[in-house]
């Protein structure tokens, strides 16, 4: 058993470092009361918009119901981009609701190892493909990496080095990086 504790000064320092390095923080809402903390950080000029907000549903804090999304819509500050993450059995229904409501979705085996009741997911790709299929079925366009960066107020990718090779200006997949360096 352990508790992950982050004090207000810790959070402020982390936000300062993220901003200094041109990174957009993901504000995770484990409880709807966390919106109050986000608003306090904005009021004290500790974070700049647009605000990338990830609402974790299905855990111990946020119920995996549409009303949770509606509450967040009402309470989040302007210039917020809301993404929904469903843990457990709420993942697929909440992802569908988020897409229909015009929000974003996070999926993957970090959050849910099941594809369906009693059926383990084969891969992250399988979970992502389901979200893509759902979005296509309702006519919801998917953002390209460049569009996502623009929505979040991020500039072009900076150059970085991985395993002795420098990348920059273009977005590379992890598969490309690994195959290029093997």
What residue ranges belong to the model's regions?
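Catalytic alpha/beta core domains of metabolic enzymes, predominantly
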Residues: 1-110, 120-126
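Structured C-terminal cap/extension of enzyme domains
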Residues: 36, 67-77, 93-182
